Structures are given as C-alpha cells and as structure tokens.
C-alpha cells in the first residue's frame, strides 16, 4: 500500500507520456501468431458493432460527478493522445458556455450503461478474437486468472479517463507484445504513476490475490486511498480460486466456469471504472477548484436544509414507530379509532390551521391532541403549551406524559399552583411541553411575549374549550388565546370539548376549522326514573321518552322511608362487579347517601376484595397520622366512598386509585368530578336534577352522563336521572334542548377581565394607543359577540371607559402624541404599580390594597415568626367567605407569644376586641372586618405550618379539612403572585427573599426532609412519608428506583403508579441537570458585545 501510495504521489508531479490505443492491451496478434485464412474476422466485427447498437435505450447509471477542466481541450485529464474513435461518441455540439453544471456531468456521457457500453463491447470483441486463435484456445480460459492477475500485466496497465470514457492502455514498448502464458514481461519502475489512485489500489488488490491463489480461504481487504475512502471490495471469486492439482481437475474447473471467467473481465473493468469515478481527479484550475468547492458546499447545505425541514420522521402520523409502541406499552392503545385517523389526516391539520373538534365524553379526544403535540415537539422542533382546567388534571397529565418525554427526548414542565418558572427556561436542544392551568397558562404566554419568544411556541392545545364562557376563568382563557392570535402568526391553536353549541362564534374568533363526530367507544343509554318506573330517553318519541321497565326490588317500609328514590335497588344491579357513580346536589348529601346505601347492603359485599379494602383504610390512617373520617371508616368496607372538595389531596388521590383498580365500586360525588379526573363507570345515577339549589344545565348533564361506559371494559353505559313529578317538564326540556351557547365574560368580569387585558396589552407593548387597543378588542371572542352582548354601550365607549379607570387608579399614564383643534391622540404607558400588578397577575380590585399592606408592613415587619408574612399573603377573595368562631379565635389569640401579639397590634386587632366578640358584648370602637377575618385565616395557616397535621388543625378550628386544604393551596398560589408583584417594585426588595422561602413552605407544608420527594408530580405527603421510610430520601433516589422494587416496598402502590413516579422523577432530574449545564455554558460563552471580539473580527476582515 505504501508503494502504491508513493506511485500515486509521483504521478502528479511527473510529466505525462503518450500511450497507445485500446488494442494494445490484448494486442492484435503478431505476424507469427496470425492464422492464414481467418475468414470470420469481418463477420465478428459486424457482430460486435450490432452489440454496441443494442445498448441504446438503457438508462444511464447514476455515478458521482467528474470534475472537468475549464476548457474543452482538457477533457483528457490524464494527458496523452486521444483515440479519435472513442472521441466520436462524445457530444461536440455544446460550447463552453452551454456546458451543464459540473456537479451534474455524467462521466459516461451518452453511453447507456457502463455494464454493456461500447467500450465493454470492444473488450469483449478482443477477448473473443484472442480466444479464437487456435494455438491460444488451450489457455483462453486461463486469461482472467493467470494473465490478468499476473504481476507483469498489473504493472503494465494504466487507466486514462477521457471525458466520459475510460481507455485501458499499455506503454509503447509493449505495444506488439501478447499475453501468452510463459512470456515474461519485465515491469518498468514507473508504469503506474499515471494510474488513478483507486485503480492503483485495485491492481494492488489483484497482485495480492494472485499471490494468495494457493490459500484455502477467501480474504477480504479494505483499502483507503490517499485522497478519499473507497467502498470495501471483495475480489471476484475467479481470481482467488484454489490451484489446480492435476490436468483433469483443471479441465473441469475451466469447462464449468468459461462464462464466469469471461464475465470476470467485464466485472474487473466495471469495478475499475467505478473506482475511477470515485477517485479524486487532479484539478488544474484554482478558480475552477474554488468554484466546485463552493458549489459542493451549497449542495450539502441544501440537502441538510431539506432534511431538517422535513416533518416526516416515521410511519405513525409522521412520528417514529417508537411512539406507537410507547402508546401500546404505557396506555395499552394498539389502534386508533376511525374518527381519530380522519381527524389527524385532515387538510387543516396538515396545513397547520387552527382546529376545533368536538366529541362526546370518553370518545378519545385527548389522544388526538397528544399525537399533534408530539408532532410539534419531535417533527417541527417547537415548544407546546397544553391548557387544562384544574390542578388535579394537570398533575395527572404530567404523570402520564413524563414517560414519553424520557423516551422521546423532550421536557414536561408543570405550571400549576405555585409551580412554574417565568420566563421559562430557554432550551437549546430539547423542546418543552408546558402543561398549565388556565391562570398559569396566561402568565406563561405573557412572559413569552415580553421576552420575544412567543414564536417558539408552535402549538397551543386547550382542553374543555367551552370554559371560555365560564366567569373570570373564561375571561382569562379568552385573553390568553387573543394575545397568541395577535402576536404570533406561526402558533397553531387546537381546541377540544364535549359540549359546544355556538361553534361558529368560536371558529370566527380562533380563525379555525371545525370537526365533529358522535362517536362513542361504548354505547350510552339514557334513562329517566319517576317513582318506581324507568323510561328510556327517545328523541323520536312524542314526549321524548318511552317506557322501559318497573323496578322489582322488594322494599320494606323502613327502607322505603330511608330510600324513597330507590338508590339501593339501582346500585345493587351493578355493584360490586361493575362500578357506579351517584351524583348528589351537595357535599353533605354525598356523605349521607353513602352511609344510607351501606346500611342496606348485605354482608356479602364486605367479602369482596376484603384484604384490599383493609389496605385502603390503613393507608388513609397513615395519611391522617392515625386519623380517619368516620364516614369513610363505615363505608369503605362495603366498597363505597364519597368524593368531593372536603377531602384532602392525599385522601382524594388514594380513593381515586382504589376506584380505578376496582377495590371501590361506588362513589357518591358532586358535579366537580364530572369535569375533573377521568373516573368512568358502568352506570351513572343523578340523584336529582339540581347542582346545589340551581337546576341542572344541559352542559352539566352531558358531562355527568358522559362518564357512563368504560372503553375496553364495559360493553354498554347507562345513565339514570331521578326526578320528581314536579320537575318532569323541565327535565324533558333539559334532555331535548340543544347545548347552551358559550358567551364571552371579558366585560362582565370587569377587574379580572377587560381592565386586566388592557393593562397587559400596554405593559407588553402589544397595543399602546386607543385605536390599536380597539382594533385588538375587535379580534377577541367578545368582539365577535359584541352585537349580542352590548345593549347599552358600544365597544368604543367601553374601551375608553376602561382606560380612564386604569389611569385614575394610577396603573396607566397617558402621553399626548398629537393635538389639534378637532382631536387629541394619546399614547399610554404603564406605571410601576401597573407593571407589578399585571406581572403578579393580581386582581385589579385588590392591587392598591396589597400595595398599602406591603408598604405598611415595611414600617414594622415582625420576623420573629412567620405570622406577619402569612397575613400579607393570605388571599383577599377568601376573606369574605370566612365566619370566625369567636371563642376559638379568642383561645388562639390568648396563646400567642408577645411577638405574635405585636403583629395583631400592628394590624389594629386587639385582644379586648376579640374577647368582647366572644362574650357577645357591644363593640364601641370600629375595627375593619376584613382585617379581622384575614388575621383569623392567618392563624389557621400559621398553626398548620407549625404542626403540619391538617386533621389536628381541622379539629382546633372546627373547619372541614378540605376547606383548610383549599385555603393552603390558594395561599401558596397567592404568595407566588405577591412575590412577582414585589419583584417589580424596588421598594419591596426585602420581601423577595422572604417570600421565596414562604411560598415553598406553603406549597408543600411538610417537614423539610419530605420536600425533595414532594417536588415529584404525583407524590403527596402520604406517599412521600412512605417513600422516605423506605429509604428513598432524595430526587436522585427516586429517579434511579426500580418500579418493581417500589411496588414490593410501598403499600398500595400499583405498577402503573410506580412507573409514573419514577418517570416524573427522571424528568425533573433531567430538567435540573439541563438547566445547570446551560447556565454553565452561558457563563463560559464569550459575550457578543465583548470589545475584543469586535476588534478580532475587524482584523480578520
């Protein structure tokens, strides 16, 4: 190889020599070799000519382009004489200026194929002529294995590329020599310096093969030329046959492989020409070389651009097949429904248009959204925001998608409650899926707009889109979507819901297409129960229902008094083998119904999964530090439990897990379960057509009955609405009328709606004058519906009035930009207080009160305890719901330390005032009721942080534990808002560090050692205690845990839950590691405005 390499290097510098034509290789026979009377010569030449003509019509083989010199005279790259017979096949009607791009020149030009071209035909003719010589027929079949592989021939051959031909030649002094066996030709020292590098390597292969003919095994050799890599070649079998032992065996071999041996010559030449095509050809023009290099780079860049812009990564809706496998592995989904396939292949989806789709509950809407999100994350390489209505659903979705993030390489980030970073971490490699509540989603979008990163958000998915018409939360959702539509032309919006009616308004607002289907994986049958008769809902019937059956359950007089609605009869038809939900009007009614049903169930129900139900009770006691709700203690042994907001988060999660696994078979619940986590049932019973004291709405009814029927488990779903005769007409209207229309609440929710919107528009500089703000409002959902919603005032008047209010409140200032006799135009800019309010997402009704409280707190902030800080972060909107127990208030007040009593004194609440209220005495001095009530709630929170036992605090203050849980969650969220509020005001610098720690304490409200475990989504206090006791004391422990070991170690932990916990821990660990790594790289990166960098670039220029 070294020798070959040196020859290749030599040939570049040595002068080129003239070489003879093709015939000299196999040489026409000399005078001594010719046989007189060879009459077939002319006929054979005609046959060869016909063979050359037959090659027309075969498509040329695609090969790598050959670089040519600047002038047509340089077509012969190797130098030397050109055979005119070969050049006549080359195109000559093209001038220099008409030449195609060099990168597209086919080295074989007009020839149809290098497997059967005229050059090969010439070689074939010469071989046939040689074989027809009588004295050479004996050795004809030996030609390929002996002469072609001999050292002398190897050294005599050289290959010259001529335009799009390849000519095989010999030196002039061997022109009249023939390739007889036994004739020795002494090789010259420099016979290969004109051979291209790949050919030199090729003949080196031949030499080595001929030396190894006696070996019994075949050898493969990989060669690399000095200029490029060549493909691994395996030498033809004909060149490495074993030596012939005797004449007989030799004869047999020759006879059986005549055709193979003849073809081997072609094979050798084909390989040689292919190698020559890949060999780097010397370039004599430096400008031409530079041009070709630039062209090659442009082609490579274009290829990479095409590859990177391709959104098709695989066969599963442009996603890798691994995604399909993960759905089968994690969720048991083997195949999509027909409607899901249709929806995913809609033109509007393919063209990235906005889309609204609506299907009944349990129809599989979420799966379509997830596939679209994965397409955006993996194919389009952009971030995704998913907006969900409740914290519990956010956490459920985080747990479900973390496994996909680990496997497919993207982050899943939680934005709910007090969790979420603003602005979000900017990832350079992996993309992020933000899963957020409505409020946190709005803050996230504001943050992205402010930092100029809104276009990094490729897709926004909104679940339960109908909530856009529900109060202040609907107004917040509308603001979020309107800002995205106005500021980003590349962000796609997907909205889904089971209950939509006036879709046209939403389509106009979102500029979206609409897709709907009535598909349900399980058939749903609706029934009405009046007295002991059950009717089936039938839209074709005259009165909307038809008789179905009579209840045949035997009721005693006692049972009839206790259960006038026949609930026991209805549930015992289903449980315990199937699940059942009973929706009740109020929380108290849920508990009463659960206890009543258990009183009349037979003892046989106690035996059904008895061991598992004992485990549930045991775990509930562990969660409550030995405390257990007496109602649950009586109902769980029968497989029955209540489900409402009075449960703590840990209790609710544990009961939901038990229901999902079939340990519990009956839930008595409020309407909030219908819109919360997915807990379907075989039968759904509506205890009454009321939610609290309000009559049921069509949307609420559809959501409740939509829980009936579990895909993959039940073959049918049933809903039964129990009603009294007096409600019959209203119920018939309820089941037949269309869904309620969805209306904007942007103006109705004044301080949480339109004013908050205007403040953020000006603060984010989306619109800063009256005309721009009015134009923005016309594009909102309210703008679409203004003709219906506005009766007394116009949109312009409302806009002017709102801006005036914000200016008077000190949140905005206006600057005159144009003034004339007829009109004055203003530009608005946000004040420091206004910026703090919109950055902290503070309700504008309370922003000035909050500012005053924080300002007053600076005058005498008491830091000996957390009580003063807790008071400052207790939500204002919960104060009006508080009705203190004055005796408890007085008892707690009297137990305060002097420093804590000092906090009350600073706030203006004295012990004497509380004592008089407790004893019922008249109060002479007027005290602010809101301050008194807020301090009472602060006592509750302060006690909870000290004791961390919600049951103990519940007993001390005589409050439902669920209320205390909600108070804690709301305070943690508001504390986060106050922190962002203070970050915008320099005067409140002291609160920043203090509120960070307080927010963390309020969020977890556990001992410090449990906080790292509770950072993992789905791990609440009870589970954190179990994990800590089992030795899992850090995030790293959980991230590296084995799910199977967790199942065996932790009580009442399913395999699915264990996998989700481990996946969530891994995701959180990766996020933290990635953030630290990016921070390090950012610190080490040279600043773009570094003076030395500018000087360096100037010097290079």
Curated annotation (Swiss-Prot):
Residues 241-258 have a biased composition (Polar residues). The keyword Nucleus applies. Residues 213-225 have a biased composition (Basic and acidic residues). InterPro entries: DEAD/DEAH_box_helicase_dom, Hel308_SKI2-like, Helicase_ATP-bd, Helicase_C-like, HTH_61, P-loop_NTPase, POLQ-like_helical, WH_DNA-bd_sf. Residues 566-758 form the Helicase C-terminal domain. ATP binds at residues 359-366. It comes from the Eukaryota. A motif (DEAH box) lies at residues 463-466. Keywords: ATP-binding, Chromosome, DNA damage, DNA repair, DNA-binding, Helicase, Hydrolase, Isomerase, Nucleotide-binding, Nucleus. ATPase activity is strongly stimulated by single-stranded DNA. Presence of ATP and Mg cofactor are required for helicase activity allowing to unwind duplex oligonucleotides up to 60-70-mer. This helicase activity is stimulated by replication protein A (RPA/RP-A) complex that binds to unwound regions and inhibits re-annealing. The keyword Iron does not apply. It holds the Pfam family POLQ_helical. Residues 346-518 form the Helicase ATP-binding domain. Signal peptide: none annotated. PANTHER family: DNA POLYMERASE THETA, PUTATIVE (AFU_ORTHOLOGUE AFUA_1G05260)-RELATED (PTHR47961), HELICASE POLQ-LIKE (PTHR47961:SF12). Homodimer. Interacts with POLN. Interacts with RAD51B and RAD51C; promoting association with the BCDX2 complex. Interacts with the replication protein A (RPA/RP-A) complex. Interacts with RAD51; stimulating HELQ DNA helicase activity and ability to unwing DNA. This is Helicase POLQ-like. It comes from Homo sapiens (Human).
């Amino acid at each position: 190889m070294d020798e070959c390499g040196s020859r290749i290097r030599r040939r570049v510098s040595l002068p080129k020599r003239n070489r003879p034509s093709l015939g000299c290789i196999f040489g026409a026979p000399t005078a001594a070799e010719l046989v007189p009377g060879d009459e077939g010569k002319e006929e054979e030449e005609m046959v060869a000519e016909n063979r050359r003509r037959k090659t027309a019509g075969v498509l040329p083989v695609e090969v790598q382009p050959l670089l040519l010199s600047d002038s047509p005279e340089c077509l012969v790259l190797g130098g030397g004489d050109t055979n005119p017979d070969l050049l006549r096949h080359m195109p000559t009607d093209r001038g220099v200026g008409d030449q195609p791009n060099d990168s597209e020149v086919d080295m074989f030009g007009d020839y149809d194929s290098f497997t059967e071209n005229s050059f090969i035909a010439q070689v074939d003719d010469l071989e046939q002529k040689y074989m027809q010589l009588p004295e050479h027929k004996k050795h004809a079949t030996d030609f390929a294995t002996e002469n072609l592989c001999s050292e002398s021939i190897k050294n005599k051959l050289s290959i010259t590329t001529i335009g799009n031909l390849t000519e095989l030649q010999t030196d002039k002094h061997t022109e009249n020599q023939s390739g007889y066996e036994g004739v020795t030709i002494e090789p010259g020292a420099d016979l290969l310096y004109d051979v291209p590098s790949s050919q030199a390597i090729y003949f080196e292969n031949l030499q080595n093969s001929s030396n190894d003919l006696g070996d019994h095994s075949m050898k493969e050799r990989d060669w690399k030329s000095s200029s490029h890599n060549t493909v691994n070649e395996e030498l033809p079998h004909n060149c490495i046959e074993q030596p012939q032992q005797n004449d007989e065996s030799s004869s047999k071999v020759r006879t059986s492989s005549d055709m193979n041996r003849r073809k081997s010559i072609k094979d050798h030449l084909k390989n040689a020409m292919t190698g020559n095509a890949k060999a780097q050809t010397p370039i004599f023009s430096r400008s031409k070389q530079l041009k070709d290099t630039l062209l090659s780079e442009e082609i490579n860049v274009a290829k990479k651009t095409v590859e990177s812009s391709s959104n098709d990564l695989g066969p599963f809706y442009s996603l890798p097949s691994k995604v399909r496998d993960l759905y089968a592995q994690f969720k048991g989904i083997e195949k999509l429904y027909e409607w899901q396939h249709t929806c995913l292949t809609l033109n509007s989806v393919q063209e990235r248009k906005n889309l609204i789709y609506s299907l009944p509950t349990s129809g599989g809407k979420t799966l379509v959204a997830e596939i679209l999100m994965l397409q955006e994350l993996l194919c389009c390489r952009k971030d995704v925001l998913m907006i969900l209505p409740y914290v519990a659903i956010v956490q459920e979705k985080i747990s479900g998608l973390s496994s996909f993030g680990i496997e497919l390489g993207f982050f899943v980030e939680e934005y709910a409650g007090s969790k979420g970073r603003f602005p979000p971490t900017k990832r350079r490699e992996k993309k992020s899926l933000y899963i957020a509540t409505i409020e946190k989603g709005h803050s996230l979008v504001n943050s992205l707009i402010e930092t100029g990163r809104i276009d990094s958000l490729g897709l926004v998915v909104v679940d339960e889109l109908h909530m856009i018409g529900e109060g202040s939360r609907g107004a917040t959702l509308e603001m979020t979507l309107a800002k995205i539509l106005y500021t980003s032309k590349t962000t796609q919006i997907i909205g889904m819901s089971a209950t939509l009616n006036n879709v046209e308004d939403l389509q106009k607002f979102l500029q979206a297409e609409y897709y709907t289907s009535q598909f349900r994986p399980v058939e749903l049958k609706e029934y009405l129960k009046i007295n002991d008769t059950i009717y089936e809902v039938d839209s074709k019937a005259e009165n909307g229902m038809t008789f179905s059956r009579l209840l045949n359950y035997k009721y005693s007089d006692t049972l009839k008094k206790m259960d006038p609605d026949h609930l026991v009869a209805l549930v015992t038809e289903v449980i315990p083998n199937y699940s059942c939900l009973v929706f009740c009007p109020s929380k108290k009614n849920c508990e009463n119904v659960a206890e009543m049903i258990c009183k009349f169930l037979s003892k046989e129900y106690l035996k059904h999964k008895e061991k598992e139900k004992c485990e549930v009770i045991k775990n509930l006691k562990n969660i409550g530090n030995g405390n257990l709700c007496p109602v649950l203690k009586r109902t769980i042994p029968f497989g029955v439990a209540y489900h409402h907001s009075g449960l703590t988060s840990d209790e609710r999660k544990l009961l939901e897990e038990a229901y999902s696994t079939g340990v519990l078979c009956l839930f008595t619940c409020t309407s909030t379960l219908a819109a919360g986590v997915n807990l379907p049932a075989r039968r759904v019973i509506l205890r009454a057509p009321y939610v609290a004291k309000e009559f049921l709405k069509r949307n609420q009814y559809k959501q409740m009955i939509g829980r009936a029927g579990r895909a993959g488990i039940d073959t049918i779903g049933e809903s039964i609405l129990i009603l009294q005769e007096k409600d019959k007409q209203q119920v018939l209207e309820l089941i037949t009328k269309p869904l309620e229309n969805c209306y904007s609440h942007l103006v109705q929710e004044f301080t949480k709606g339109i004013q908050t919107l205007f403040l953020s528009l000006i603060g984010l500089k989306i619109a800063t004058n009256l005309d721009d703000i009015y134009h923005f409002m016309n594009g909102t959902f309210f703008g679409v519906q203004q003709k219906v919603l506005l009766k007394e005032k116009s949109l312009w008047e409302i806009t002017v009035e709102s801006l005036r209010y914000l200016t008077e409140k000190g949140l905005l200032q206006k600057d005159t930009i144009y003034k004339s006799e007829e009109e004055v135009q203003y530009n608005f800019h946000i004040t420091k207080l206004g910026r703090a309010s919109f950055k902290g997402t503070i309700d504008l009704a309370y922003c000035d009160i909050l500012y005053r409280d924080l300002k007053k707190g600076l005058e005498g902030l008491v830091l000996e305890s957390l009580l003063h800080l807790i008071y400052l972060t207790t939500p204002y909107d919960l104060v009006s719901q508080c009705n203190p127990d004055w005796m408890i208030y007085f008892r707690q007040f009297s137990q305060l330390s002097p420093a804590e009593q000092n906090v009350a004194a600073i706030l203006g609440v004295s012990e004497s005032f509380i004592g008089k209220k407790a004893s019922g005495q008249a109060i002479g001095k007027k005290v602010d009721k809101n301050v008194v009530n807020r301090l009472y709630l602060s006592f509750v929170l302060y006690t909870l942080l000290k004791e961390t036992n919600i049951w103990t605090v519940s007993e001390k203050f005589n409050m439902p534990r669920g209320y205390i849980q909600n108070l804690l969650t709301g305070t943690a969220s508001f504390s986060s808002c106050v922190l962002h509020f203070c970050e915008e005001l320099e005067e409140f610098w002291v609160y920043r560090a203090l509120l960070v720690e307080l927010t963390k304490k309020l969020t977890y409200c556990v001992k410090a050692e449990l906080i790292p475990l509770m950072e993992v989504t789905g791990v609440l206090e009870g589970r954190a205690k179990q994990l800590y006791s089992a030795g899992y004391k850090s995030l790293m422990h959980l991230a590296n845990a084995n799910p199977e070991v967790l199942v065996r170690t932790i009580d009442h932990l399913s395999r699915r839950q264990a996998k989700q916990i481990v996946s969530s821990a891994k995701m959180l660990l990766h996020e933290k590691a990635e953030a630290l790594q990016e921070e390090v790289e950012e610190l080490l990166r040279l600043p773009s405005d570094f003076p030395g960098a500018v000087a360096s670039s100037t010097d290079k220029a």
